Amino acid sequence: MEVGDKIHNTNEQITALEKKKYQIETTLLEKQRDLLKLETQQNKAKLELLFELSEVLTQLEGEEWVSATIALRIIKRNKRKYLDLFDLNDDKAYVNKDKFKFLHDEFFELKQQLNDI
């Protein structure tokens, strides 16, 4: 094989490697985009929950109860975690006094998580 052929083969190999590198980088960027999209969706859900918990705490400043609609939205997010938090009565939801500290702590923990992001 002549020197010219070796150079040509080497150039073809370099071109093939550069294409492969580009494909890998593209795949990596797509995966990073997908992860960012997932994180954004999770943060959106956390922000919505934070807002709803904030509404509950704000309403409780002047009343003993909150809107059942807000309480049901919170319960739907995680039934196991939030079901015992409220006593539902018609269109009112009373926060269980034993669980008020949990509600308060949950609000500040969620707020801290979102601040860390």
Curated annotation (Swiss-Prot):
Tree of life domain: Bacteria
Keyword Coiled coil: yes
Coiled coil: 5-50
Record key words, sorted: Coiled coil
Name of the featured protein: SPbeta prophage-derived uncharacterized protein YosX
Organism: Bacillus subtilis (strain 168)
